[in-house]
Amino acid sequence: MFDPRDKQLGDLETVYSAFMETLKNLASEKFLASLGDWTPRDIAAHFVGWNRITLVGCSELREGVEPFYFYDGTNDYRKINARFLEQFPSTDRDELLKEITVTKDALVAYLKTIPESEWELDTGIVHYRGNPATIARCVDSLVRDYPKHRQEILDAFGTD
């Protein structure tokens, strides 16, 4: 259903790099400018948090435990995302970019320890949208989220 581990991890690195380049090239005054519901700063905090909890969620799945954040899935993770904005309040772009990198690197280092045989293993946990919740599915969520939010910034500010 999903790509093999190394392909997905390569895709994650690609979309992460593109997102980071967009944030680095963004004019400083636009980092805190509104995109409607949030700002590029908020999106950066969002990724610091999601990199961290994706690692935890993958670890929980390996133990056959539902990831703690699934409770908020039908709410589009609004409670989880709001918590990240409070938990990571910095408005310093360089600090947040560094934290995204540190948390992404920790996630990828952990994911590289997972055998391919466990990548799409069904441990009995069902994703709130149906079908098995797997490590591959968790990684796929990030692989789709980075470009989605990058495009949101590009659409608002025409930067690239």
Predicted region positions:
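Acidic/histidine-rich alpha-helical segments that form the ligand environment
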Residues: K79-E120
